[in-house]
């Protein structure tokens, strides 16, 4: 269908250089997340100018960060020339300032039950960022306040549903006890409330402007995969993908797995025939679900297809999210080697055909690859040679080099490319440094650290922690022999002594407590441990911890990182914990500060003087937000250093892991992974990253620890290259390293200049966008 775009949409669509979308729901592609936020903001303001008393429904979570920032910035600086220019350049009429105070707001969804005053409730988010942030009238807001949802017996929800476990099957079955009867009546009361909420939305005339994200399973609001397209407001259980995504909000998968949600339905969104429905998505992790949602006919397995009958439906996408769509660039002359290889890989997959059997006819018969210039008999041969070169590079790893391995979080480096590190650390001629940029405290659950403190208390009382009796321990002894802690712990791993491992971990916990709180005696130590345990018992899961608790959790993760690289024989003096200050556990992460965040990186690079710097490379800015902010920080440090000294010989190795990955065309180095390397990864991860062993914050792709997902990714990447090069390339190879290959690690190699050019696009889009 030919899309009828508004003036704002036309302005952004023209910049994408794409033909008119052929999907049933039109889409617009932008370069990055900040531009995605600008597009959604300007389209929202454009609609409010035409509908100043309309009904809006806006999203929660991290996705709308730049939508919120842009909207607040534009409205706060409406009369400034730079804002007027931004609006005019992007199709928004500036003759009249939008006023939002007469709009009616409908909350999309909420966890149930949840205290609305908690910072991780969507009710809190809506109040803070929309009612207060946008100046909406609270009297015009229809919100989901869990504490005000009635139950028929006027008891607390926790008394009715112990541990907040709600069994919705009680709707349909007989009860077996008095408590189940109470629960059944309460569920019916919630159902009644949901029905009344739906009616209130209908009384407003339905939703006029809906903006929402799309979940990994395709969920719109909390309408998960399989939801009826005629669904209305209701309480429901979610699926694993949604629970994994919600784990960071609720304090772990252990909580989100049992927490229900209240959500408006798909028909609630589309009931108003004039509704504007915008779904926005960023990053390649969303590319597959975006493709299915736009290119498959109406299907309950893809909730967004329910929107296809609404003429006002749109998808706003970053390049990464639009990556798999069958789109054709207007400028057919812009075929880089990488782009040619990317499309030929897609063609092999679509045809399920080995690359060596790809013919010029196959290439010419495909709508997209037929546009590749100068197609001939050598096209596929050249393609295969370029793929082989990426693999051959793995045989030429550096010797007598200094490598600075950097990670945004603890475990990022291990999960990114540990088989490469196996080879780098084998040579005593190489010097390896490891630096983790943030303290990583958000991935440690309250329950885990509380249990660890209880074990520590038991060991102190049973006199199993002898070091605290040394006369100088509370003065400076606590800060000594940390390397010995690590060595002894790994000794206990070798001897399979789990008690010894726990004791070693508690030793490090004691050192951290004395360090953080400047404790001076055993009595003070015991009191402080009891105080912290009491704190954890009184706070809710997912609550933002105070700085001292954040530091305690972070120091636990730092010990885990030291264990990991000591596992590989690295001296802990070569392991750096930078604790960059922008990482605070806020809903929206701060922009890195030059003095606070950049200078420590400059100091580290000057101190280590590396030949190679590794980093988590997210060129679109749509991976985990911390990854992106760390990339910004390292880029700025290198930009400053490049002005002070020659950095031309320094190589950058970009890696990705469980959150985001390279495709086979953009990777420069493909490193073989043997079954032995996979076993080492799993053993290292489960023995060293103890707080992550239970996978409290899993990826939506796998219900288990990250090491298992990493192995799956490596195997999938190898499977792609088996298709391209043929299986015989591997099992008949003359090199035993390749014959033993069952997975592949992808890396991208850049010069500092090339990296800065990549990072500058990101840096300019944020720093130069006026909204920091």
Regions found by a protein language model. Name each.
Residues 3-24, 84-208:
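Ligand-binding beta-strand-loop-alpha-helix segment within the catalytic cores
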Residues 167-184, 343-648, 654, 686-687, ...:
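Active-site beta-strand->loop->alpha-helix modules in alpha/beta enzyme cores, enriched
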Residues 55-59, 208-214, 249-294, 314-317, ...:
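Glycine-rich anion-binding loop/nest that anchors nucleotide
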Residues 222-252, 296-311, 636:
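Gly/Ser/Thr-rich active-site loops/lids in small-molecule metabolic enzymes
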Residues 2-7, 24-25, 264-362:
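ATP/nucleoside-binding phosphotransfer catalytic cores, i.e., glycine-rich phosphate-binding loops
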Residues 67-95, 413-436:
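Histidine-anchored nucleotide/phosphate-binding helix
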Residues 1-56, 72-80, 86-87, 93-94, ...:
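N-terminal glycine-/serine-/threonine-rich phosphate-binding loop
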Residues 661-723:
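A conserved mid-domain beta-alpha-beta active-site/ligand-binding segment of alpha/beta enzyme cores
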